[in-house]
Amino acid sequence: MPSETLWEIAKAEVEKRRCHGSDGDGMEIGEKSVFFIGSKNGGKTTIILRCLDRDEPAKPTLALEYTYGRKTKGHNTPKDIAHFWELGGGTSLLDLISIPITVDTLRTFSIVLVLDLSKPNDLWPTMENLLQATKSHVDKVTMKLGKANSKASSEMRQRMWSVMQKDHPDRELIDPFPIPLVIIGSKYDIFQDFDPEKRKVICKTLRFVAHYYGASLMFTSKSEALLLKMRGVINQLAFGIDKSKSMCVDQNKPLFITAGLDSLCQIGSPPVPDSDIGKLQAHSPMELWKKVYEKLFPPKSTSTLKAIQDPARDPQYAESEVDEMRVQKDQELEQYKRSSSKTWKQIELDS
């Protein structure tokens, strides 16, 4: 009997993995995916490059970017592969969230939400819009997965709650994000010079949001020590390296809190006088924290937040021939609009 070809061996391996995955018996996934979302110009690309040891300048992310990294577990073992996705444009391209997260990839995914601490007025709407859009899509995909593979869907729910110990006092008061979530506050070097009361509100608010969603929370900057900590957190998501158990909740220092280690008791109540809490009329703890936060940091208009420069006019992506043709077509379009407008006016006059 002739030996199998390389193609036949590869095909058999794929079929074996597919069958193994459909059994839903707690398979260990070798390839993982990390999806970076967050503030526009918040430092997502820089974080990815740092995690991958790539010494190259960070370029603005136009829409949805992809890259990957490899890591060797040990001698003579195949390298683990991690897929890195990045959503550009802040909150302006929410529709693209659905592209990388599918039924086939859902169980490999983790989310990293990068928030620019130097722009506190944009922080809540950016966080809220991105998390809501991501959760909505993940919930839909999870439902599809449940119909095709109920055991795998059940395992995802168990993993979702595994960040919180069974005897944790807040277990009944939180709503874990459906897939692993890390919240990174970037540009701490600017944030540390803020007024202490403003820092206190931002720190307590982010601690509450992270705890409510069962997420890890950390602040980072250009500091080498903070970058190493951040890299360790991302490597844990991408390659399954052990979680750090260290913790820092001092608002005068960069926060570092692993998922499940914080508590509502430690976080405390929203930083507002007790006499004002009753006036806020919130229907949930999350809404209460939002109202308190936005009282101090009123959000800018949504149109400002969603504004994005026309990539066709960005000099970074200049293409002389394409740009000349674009100008010509724009002129033709304007002429057509004027011509059509005259035609309709003439029809109205004739009638």
From Swiss-Prot:
Subcellular location: Cytoplasm; Cell projection, Cilium; Cytoplasm, Cytoskeleton, Cilium basal body; Cytoplasm, Cytoskeleton, Cilium axoneme
One GO MF term: dynein heavy chain binding
InterPro entries, sorted: DYNC2LI1 (IPR040045), Dynein_light_int_chain (IPR022780), P-loop_NTPase (IPR027417)
Signal sequence, renumbered to the chain: none
UniProt feature, compositional bias: Basic and acidic residues: 323-335
Tagged with keyword Cytoplasm: yes
GO biological process: cilium assembly; determination of left/right symmetry; intraciliary retrograde transport; intraciliary transport involved in cilium assembly; regulation of cilium assembly
A GO cellular component entry from the record: motile cilium
Keyword entries, A-Z: Cell projection, Cilium, Cilium biogenesis/degradation, Cytoplasm, Cytoskeleton, Developmental protein, Dynein, Microtubule, Motor protein
Domain of life: Eukaryota
Region of interest called Disordered, as start-end residue ranges on this chain: 304-335
Keyword set includes Cytoplasm: yes
Quaternary organization: Light intermediate chain of the cytoplasmic dynein complex 2, a multisubunit complex composed at least of eleven different proteins. The cytoplasmic dynein 2 complex consists of two catalytic heavy chains (HCs) and a number of non-catalytic subunits presented by intermediate chains (ICs), light intermediate chains (LICs) and light chains (LCs).
Function in brief: Acts as one of several non-catalytic accessory components of the cytoplasmic dynein 2 complex (dynein-2 complex), a motor protein complex that drives the movement of cargos along microtubules within cilia and flagella in concert with the intraflagellar transport (IFT) system, facilitating the assembly of these organelles. Involved in the regulation of ciliary length.
Family: Belongs to the dynein light intermediate chain family.
Name of the protein in question: Cytoplasmic dynein 2 light intermediate chain 1
Lineage per the UniProt record: Eukaryota, Metazoa, Chordata, Craniata, Vertebrata
